[in-house]
């Protein structure tokens, strides 16, 4: 109901932690500083009622499926889909914390696309359904290089490859 939503949503909140209140009778757990949970809770949000935008800046057709929009810059290509958004948040968290060795995604064919290898100057060579590393660039630890890596991940990984890496929690 609208009344229940209004008690859970604080329209003035600027992060998920300050925008989305725990339901009545519940408390938010304490999470360690620099943990992924803390990162998600403190990630900046766009103002309340902001529309979800597509890569080209147009509005997504269903604007009733979200209660908040992360202040995450859009990329120009139509690559970031459902699972890609989850992969991006994880990768952004590890990149921001300098934990580059933890950025690793399996492509749909099972190939392990390690960001540490990418930033060392290796690039992924695809030949049919096979992938391999080829040293073809200079080492680069810039954010632009990270975004190029993520474009490859978005192109060749997705829900299927994430499912093989996911662990159940219950």
Language-model region placement:
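N-terminal module-boundary/linker segments of secreted carbohydrate-active enzymes
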Residues: 2-64, 68, 73-81
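Exposed alpha-helical structural elements
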Residues: 35-38, 114-117, 145-149
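Surface-exposed patches in mature extracellular/periplasmic domains of secreted proteins
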Residues: 73-78, 94-108
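Stable alpha-helical elements in mature extracytoplasmic
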Residues: 78, 82-85, 89-90, 142, ...
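Low-complexity, serine/threonine/proline-enriched polar segments
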Residues: 127-150
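...with weaker cross-activation on analogous glycine-rich loops/strands in unrelated enzymes
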Residues: 144-170
């Amino acid at each position: 109901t609208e009344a229940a939503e209004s008690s859970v949503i604080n329209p003035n909140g600027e992060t998920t932690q300050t925008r989305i209140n725990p339901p009545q009778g519940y408390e938010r757990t304490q999470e360690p500083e620099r943990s992924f949970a803390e990162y998600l809770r403190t990630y900046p949000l766009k103002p309340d009622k902001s529309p979800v935008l597509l890569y080209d800046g147009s509005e997504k057709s269903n604007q009733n499926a979200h209660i908040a929009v992360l202040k995450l810059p859009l990329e120009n290509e139509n690559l970031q889909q459902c699972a890609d958004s989850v992969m991006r948040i994880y990768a952004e968290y590890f990149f921001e914390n300098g934990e580059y060795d933890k950025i690793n995604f399996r492509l749909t064919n099972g190939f392990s696309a390690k960001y540490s290898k990418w930033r060392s100057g290796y690039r992924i060579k695809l030949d049919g359904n096979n992938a391999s590393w080829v040293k073809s660039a200079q080492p680069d630890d810039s954010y632009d290089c990270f975004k190029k890596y993520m474009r490859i991940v978005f192109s060749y990984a997705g829900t299927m490859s994430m499912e093989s890496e996911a662990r159940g929690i219950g």
